[in-house]
Amino acid sequence: GDVGYINSNNTKIKVLDCKKINLADKIIFLHKVKVIKGYINADEVFNLEVNTENRKEISSHHTSTHLLHEALREEFGTNVKQKGSLVSNEKLRFDFNLNHPIQSNLLKKIEDVVNQKIYQNDKVNTEIMDQKSAMEKGAIALFGEKYGDKVRVVSMGKSITRKRIAWSVELCGGTHLQTVGEAIRFKIIGESGVASGVRRIEAVTRKSAMLYYEDKNCLLYTSDAADES
């Protein structure tokens, strides 16, 4: 989640993480913090300072998760469903139902589909609507997730069928990029099995993708230097 600082005239608090907690009658946001200076007083006025670069990296991995989900559905069929996911400032992790490993040529194909969408740089659209209307527009809902009467629909990419308002359409309350092009680059760094009939893909975007390629180049240069010696 978000990181940053909570400041007042006499107090400085570092926010290490933020979590959204769904209770029976309300939603709360839990902040994990470290007090660097001063004390936390209930009647004090604080200024909140969000680390926007960290949020951008998380948003990039979240938006790219939606693109990956749709690319998998396109390759293996619409029966592919999300079984779990994690988005951080460093990478994304996506679990989905599939009963066999994915060959390297298909992983490359899926990666290329996501990057093609990123290069098209379409706008990420968000809209609040009733759940029935969302389903009629082709939105994907997560199995087991509880939704209210009004839902937030996140869509991106040009639709290839009249049944959907966009290429990717999902019910989602998370933070996203404004345009998919802000993800810059998508790179799959791992594919594995985590349970019977469940596969996992790990990938990086933006800064993490650039660092990945820099590391690969460093290894290549080191190898070339070793060969020459």
Enumerate the predicted regions with their spans.
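A glycine- and charged-residue-rich anion-binding loop/surface
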Residues: 1-223, 229
